[in-house]
Amino acid sequence: MLFRSKIYGPKGIGALYVRRRDPQVRLEPLIDGGGHERGLRSGTVAVPLVVGLGLAVELAVRERPEEALRILEYRERLHEGIARRVPAIRLNGPPGDRLPGNLNLSFADVDGEALMMAMRDVAVSSGSACSSASPEPSHVLLAMGLDEDVARASLRFGLGRFTTAEEIDFAIEAVAAAVARLRKKSVAWTTQDGA
């Protein structure tokens, strides 16, 4: 399955690859009628969206090496900048084998949801988009062996094609300021800090 949002394609389209011979999964139509695509889809496909998705795929393939390197540099700049300004953070996941545009950090004695709300001008998440309504900690972080408190203290930063150096620097400052404000209110942090 190809999600257009991951490659900056037009809204309203995606792609599903199904091998022709002996598919492992039997597909059922979502909407009956029309008989298009061997009875799996009804209605006419919007040709401009198909062309747009094709162009997005072409651009993603062509620009991937340079884009991945640039995004990786920004991710490292963000991580190192936050690490310099904010004590007691933890990188969630392996330091090496990671997607360039994904940074997940835990902040000791800070609730991830509260931190996210304290940084209204920085787009971050405390879980995946598909589980954003769930109050539970990230099942992925728990499966990685993090305890619930650490998982709840985590934020995910997503970087992409349109991320700028100025946004990285702004995010570093916003995270540092918000964590400092929240930790001042944290009994666990102030007790540990000796304040």
Region annotations inferred by a language model:
Residues 1-29, 33-38, 42-55:
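Active-site PLP attachment segment
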Residues 3-4, 27, 40, 93, ...:
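Thr-Gly-centered strand-to-loop micro-motif
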Residues 56-80, 90-99:
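Structural signature of PLP-dependent enzymes
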Residues 49, 137-195:
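PLP-dependent enzyme catalytic core of the Aspartate aminotransferase-like
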Residues 42, 46-50, 64-75, 112, ...:
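Generic structural signal for well-ordered, non-membrane alpha-helical segments
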Residues 103-156:
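Conserved C-terminal alpha-helix-loop-beta "cap" of PLP-dependent enzymes
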Residues 10, 24, 47-50, 75, ...:
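A general structural signal for well-ordered alpha-helical segments in protein cores
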Residues 14-16, 38, 78-82, 87-118:
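Anionic-ligand binding region
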